[in-house]
Amino acid sequence: MADGRSIVVFHPTSYRDSRPIGERFRDGDVVLCDLSWLEPDEAHRLVDFVAGLVFGLGGNIYKVTAHVLVLAPPGVTVLDDAEHLTGSFYNQS
């Protein structure tokens, strides 16, 4: 991204993988999380974690598919011209 931010893709396999996700989001990067490798209870815990993270830092979460989330930090707008995004299920604005 032009302003020095990155788009970082994570494929977590357990809740233990939440820390680097949080660190990259906290640093202002856009984070794409593919939760398809997680067991349902682990996925639920991770979604709870990122929801709190995004709320605390004023960003947005977008559900791209049933298992893929985009975490957008403040100041980043996610657009989808094909209307595949089911919408922001947490919008701080």
Specify the residue positions occupied by each region the protein language model found.
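Positively charged, small/polar-rich N-terminal and surface patches that mediate targeting and assembly
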Residues: M1-V31, S36, A51-S93
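Acidic, metal-coordinating catalytic cores used for nucleic-acid/nucleotide bond scission
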Residues: E39
